[in-house]
Amino acid sequence: MPASISRSTYASMFGPTTGDRLRLGDTELVIEVERDLTTYGEEVKFGGGKVIRDGMGQSQRTRAEGAMDTVITNALIVDWTGIYKADVGLRDGRIAKIGKAGNPDTQPGVDIVIGPGTEIIAGEGRILTAGGMDAHIHFICPQQIEDSLHSGITTMLGGGTGPAHGTLATTCTPGPWHIGRMLQAADAFPINLAFAGKGNASLPAGLEEQVRAGASCLKLHEDWGTTPAAIDCCLSVADRMDVQVMIHTDTLNESGFVENTLAAIGGRTIHAFHTEGAGGGHAPDIIKVVGAANVIPSSTNPTMPYTANTVEEHLDMLMVCHHLDRSIPEDVAFAESRIRKETIAAEDILHDMGAFSVISSDSQAMGRVGEVITRTWQTAHKMKVQRGRLAEETGANDNQRVRRYIAKYTINPAIAHGLSRHIGSVEEGKRADLVLWQPAFFGAKPDLVLLGGMIVCAQMGDPNGSIPAQPYYSRPMFGAFGGALHASAVTFVSQAAEEDGVGERLRLQKGTLAVQGTRDIGKADMKLNAHRPSIEVNPETYEVRADGELLTCQPLAELPLAQRYFLY
């Protein structure tokens, strides 16, 4: 006879199931399990007296006969594709199957085989997400990588060579020599990396050599001169060589206004950085480009969300990041032209509408590399508090809003940069770059981070304890060391560099993967974030209107996922 147990008892044993709801951290966001791919009464769980034992939930099948390398049991997947419960099977560093795990010789409906060679990660009561992608990195110091990884980011894309002044201001790794050195340096780090070449040139040869050297994308930055000629040249090279172009437009409007920049872009695909404008771009109306079909608009996290301290801290940050001098009036005016509370407030709302598609950091150059994920969920919380439930929500949950916001740092930057065949979502065939969270710590402190199917960092207690005793904090694990590091992480390069054998030429120890499909995409390809409102900015008051509606909200004085989570 089947046994019946209460929902609370079931959830404590196997995690929440269809119809159960849970809160994300200390936010006002509540998710509901949409479906459950496991089978009631046939759930697998590891431990003393539990199911995954020889002849029970564990079969006799070898790896050659289809047994998984690792199975994550009973995980609650939170992804742009949905919010659902499943077992997840990993093989060869990728997601092999999402479904029902167990022993097909003793259990019905098993499509994920557990064998003697299978490791188990207990996902009961935990949330599983794709590893995050930060697509706006100034590689100013290598220590950024540790902070980023331990926050749940598994892929970093950007440019730089260290604390050189070009890197402090712009996300470019200029020239074949520097690109080669950064590709070699990437071998040391347990994270996926990709590098941007400098895109500011009026003739193509200097850009083409950077793409052939291994640049996965090109960056146009106003500090190097983002003129119409440079924009056109860079995009022409990108179209021929299939790499993405990121743009930081002309704050001073020296070589044209936002309309001139859009004309120079000419309908070609481009990723617009910090599209609100505080991070740089045509003042005061760069935010207009969120309505363009060919522009992928993104935010950097210092303005996300709009709080009581946002405006005050920005002026000092900007003076430092762009090598400005307070004694020069023109430098001060340049800085002040970029900080507008009206456009910063509108940015939150445009994210909630799905008009901004991506959130990234702008690491150490007005952004915080370890806070991309936290600030994304703080913004989602703020918008629920201030705007209420989304009209498209069904049921007593925030699933649609949660799916929209998680897409901003997972699938959408991956699509924008030609990486979505490999990363960006919890889907079969993609790399097993995954993050497990305790729901109470969701968005603040990951429990486990997997890279290529191996644990690279985790919350861990005293190594000298008889058990892993408190205090717990995130520490590097075995996947972050030795040859395992090189087998788990990859470096993304251009197709031209991959075909030229860049890995062998530079004797890289990490594998390389080519970016692909960056030019025939646009705003419509941004998952759950493809809205294209018509934006108008009042040049005197800076008020922002979308399709005629005034966009304004108040700054928050207190946020979730903040001080109470970071005592140590």
Swiss-Prot record:
Residues that hold Ni(2+) 2 according to the record: K219, H248, H274
Metal-binding among keywords: yes
Coiled coil: none
Source organism superkingdom: Bacteria
Compartments reported by the entry: Cytoplasm
Keywords attached to this entry: Cytoplasm, Hydrolase, Metal-binding, Nickel
Binding, Ni(2+) 1: H136, H138, K219, D362
Keyword GTP-binding annotated: no
One GO term describing the cellular component: cytoplasm
Cofactor binding note: Binds 2 nickel ions per subunit.
Reported modifications of this chain: Carboxylation allows a single lysine to coordinate two nickel ions.
Active-site feature positions: H322 (proton donor)
One of the Pfam families matching this protein, by short name: Urease_alpha
Modified residues annotated as N6-carboxylysine in this record: K219
Enzyme class: hydrolase
Cofactor: Ni cation
UniProt-annotated binding residues for substrate: H221
Transmembrane segments: none
Family per record: Belongs to the metallo-dependent hydrolases superfamily. Urease alpha subunit family.
PANTHER family for this protein: UREASE (PTHR43440:SF1)
Assembly description: Heterotrimer of UreA (gamma), UreB (beta) and UreC (alpha) subunits. Three heterotrimers associate to form the active enzyme.
Protein name: Urease subunit alpha
Species: Cereibacter sphaeroides (strain ATCC 17023 / DSM 158 / JCM 6121 / CCUG 31486 / LMG 2827 / NBRC 12203 / NCIMB 8253 / ATH 2.4.1.)
Protein's gene: ureC
